[in-house]
Curated annotation (Swiss-Prot):
Gene encoding the protein: COMMD3
Ranges where the COMM domain occurs: 124-193
The protein's name: COMM domain-containing protein 3
Role summary: Scaffold protein in the commander complex that is essential for endosomal recycling of transmembrane cargos; the commander complex is composed of the CCC subcomplex and the retriever subcomplex. May modulate activity of cullin-RING E3 ubiquitin ligase (CRL) complexes. May down-regulate activation of NF-kappa-B. Modulates Na(+) transport in epithelial cells by regulation of apical cell surface expression of amiloride-sensitive sodium channel (ENaC) subunits.
Cellular component per GO, a single term: nucleus
Keywords: Cytoplasm, Ion transport, Nucleus, Sodium, Sodium transport, Transcription, Transcription regulation, Transport, Ubl conjugation pathway
Subunit relationships: Component of the commander complex consisting of the CCC subcomplex and the retriever subcomplex. Component of the CCC (COMMD/CCDC22/CCDC93) subcomplex consisting of COMMD1, COMMD2, COMMD3, COMMD4, COMMD5, COMMD6, COMMD7, COMMD8, COMMD9, COMMD10, CCDC22 and CCDC93; within the complex forms a heterodimer with COMMD2. Interacts with NFKB1/p105. Interacts with CCDC22, CCDC93, SCNN1B, CUL3, CUL4A, CUL4B, CUL5.
Lineage: Eukaryota, Metazoa, Chordata, Craniata, Vertebrata
Organism: Bos taurus (Bovine)
Amino acid sequence: MELSEYVQKGFQMLADPGSFDSNTFTLLLRAAFQSLLDAQADEAVLDHPDLKHIDPVVLKHRHAAAATYILEAGKQRADRSTLSTYLEDCKFDSERIELFWTEYQNNRNSLEILLGSIGRSLPHITDVSWRLEYQIKTNQLDKMYRPAYLVTLNVENTDSRSHPEISFSCNMEQLQDLVGKLKDASKSLERATQL
């Protein structure tokens, strides 16, 4: 499995019994599965009392690493030997490997359904709209307020024939960067089709 260095480091830290005891590891692993599989899950999955003693930044890093590995394992439909090999490479002991495998088996079907619902192709942008975001002035002189833009991309999902919208907010520089990248992508596609 090819994971980024950041994810690998976070995942290897989960193997350290000094950082995460067995109970904490199990709670974090269940929280990772819950945040992936439960649409209503939010940051409250990490609010368990036994996880309060861990620095929130460290906790979120390990949680993200575990969730990324779970998704990658599900995407590749990893079997027990594949999981064990990778976990051993990350210095997991046999107890943690068994805990991971048990949790993975319990959630495997739901994970495969989730991954299957995502689709196999990227959404196609069909339209874009933008507007200036409203700014409220305050009496704070130390902050400089710059215009922000609300951008809405209308997309078409060819797998599900749905037409969802993707909305985000950005500042002037980010908007210019987005427009530049879209122009570059358009030129690259034109060149590719002319070959």
